[in-house]
Amino acid sequence: MGDTFIRHIALLGFEKRFIPSQHYVYMFLVKWQDLSEKVVYRKFTEIYEFHKMLKEMFPIEAGEIHTENRVIPHLPAPRWFDGQRAAESRQGTLTEYFNGLMGLPVKISRCPHLLDFFKVRPDDLKLPTDSQAKKPETYLVPKDGKNNVADITGPIILQTYRAIADYEKSSGTEMTVATGDVVDVVEKSESGWWFCQMKTKRGWVPASYLEPLDSPDEAEDPDPNYAGEPYVTIKAYAAVEEDEMSLSEGEAIEVIHKLLDGWWVVRKGDITGYFPSMYLQKAGEEITQAQRQIRGRGAPPRRSTIRNAQSIHQRSRKRLSQDTYRRNSVRFLQQRRRPGRPGPLSTDGTKDNPSTPRVKPQPAVPPRPSSDLILHRCTESTKRKLTSAV
């Protein structure tokens, strides 16, 4: 797995789901070595199967050979009929279990089995749709409660943002915010939907409705990459604003600027424009996984379309115009298409190689003088020798 490892794990709570049948899943916030934070959902039966496999991989540390050598914590088996009370009471057990695992030597705490278990799966990104008859019920661990044992491996510092306008949720997985509300951002999804918490509420909020407290600019926005990354559209989109781009499904484009609000700058030929990142998939990857992610949720609104936005900052956000993107993009493409400039040439027309030692040139050989010139300029002795030789 290289240098990949998990820094922290926090238990956020659990969900009661009804599709395909009633069951419970636990919500974990996982912080990786690159400081990225992801929310994953796992059933207790999955966690227990993970535990059994871990014991098989490390029988000595599991106490299978000698009980006194056991360091892997105990995890009780699931019951036949688990209800909401059992799901709630089990949160403390899970916290202690993963707290114990993360404190073990790296051969266990960073083993591929543990890392793979907490990797984001397609189902973790598949949010319930409004068409579902009964939506999941979320039960959160109190943020400041006395029995808050959700923090498994240490504090996870969440970034704080402020809402610049009222946003009314349109589904059960979103969260309503009012102008001036301060929220903690749990996860920044590339789609432009951020998972936030405010007191005992959690849900998805469009990133365009949020601003940092210390600056109007998003410090984590990367710089443009005019070399471009190849992507494919997995859903058609018709431009609404002048600086957006209309594309059909299945078109190949290049992404030149990935912005955290979920509206990326893409390039098609020499044309650039904004396009929803939710409708893009990296070229060469399975499209079916990305299509699962966009079901039941549309592209987030752009900040330019928000009415009555009220920022606490005096200056507005710094944004490049599409004219600037196009101009810089065209300049980059022209330089890329231009053949390489020849290096300095030597007198014989060949390129000089700086790594090759230079040889001093030999002096030029003068042309041989003619016989008449020799007879005219030579001495009498030389004339007699030349005359006798003829």
Curated annotation (Swiss-Prot):
It comes from the Eukaryota. It is found in: Cytoplasm, Cytosol; Membrane. PROSITE patterns: PX (PS50195), SH3 (PS50002). One of its GO terms (molecular function) is phosphatidylinositol binding. Its main location: cytoplasm. One of its GO terms (biological process) is respiratory burst involved in defense response. Residues 291-390 are annotated as: Disordered. GO terms for cellular component: cytoplasm; cytoplasmic side of plasma membrane; cytosol; dendrite; membrane; NADPH oxidase complex; neuronal cell body. The modification Phosphoserine is found at S304, S321, S329, S346. Keywords: Cytoplasm, Lipid-binding, Membrane, Phosphoprotein, Repeat, SH3 domain. Residues 374-383 have a biased composition (Basic and acidic residues). Residues 156-215, 226-285 form the SH3 domain. Phosphorylated by PRKCD; phosphorylation induces activation of NCF1, leading to assembly and activation of the NADPH oxidase complex. Residues 4-125 form the PX domain. It holds the Pfam family PX. It is a peripheral membrane protein. Component of the phagocyte NADPH oxidase complex composed of an obligatory core heterodimer formed by the membrane proteins CYBA and CYBB and the cytosolic regulatory subunits NCF1/p47-phox, NCF2/p67-phox, NCF4/p40-phox and the small GTPase RAC1 or RAC2. Part of a cytosolic complex composed at least by NCF1, NCF2 and NCF4. Interacts (via C-terminus) with NCF2 (via the C-terminal SH3 domain). Interacts with NCF4. Interacts with CYBB. Interacts (via the second SH3 domain) with CYBA; interaction is phosphorylation-dependent. Interacts with NOXA1. Interacts with ADAM15. Interacts with TRAF4. The PX domain mediates interaction with phosphatidylinositol 3,4-bisphosphate and other anionic phospholipids. In the autoinhibited, unphosphorylated state an intramolecular interaction with the C-terminal SH3 domain precludes phospholipid binding and interaction with CYBA. Phosphorylation disrupts the autoinhibited state. Subunit of the phagocyte NADPH oxidase complex that mediates the transfer of electrons from cytosolic NADPH to O2 to produce the superoxide anion (O2(-)). In the activated complex, electrons are first transferred from NADPH to flavin adenine dinucleotide (FAD) and subsequently transferred via two heme molecules to molecular oxygen, producing superoxide through an outer-sphere reaction. This is Neutrophil cytosol factor 1.
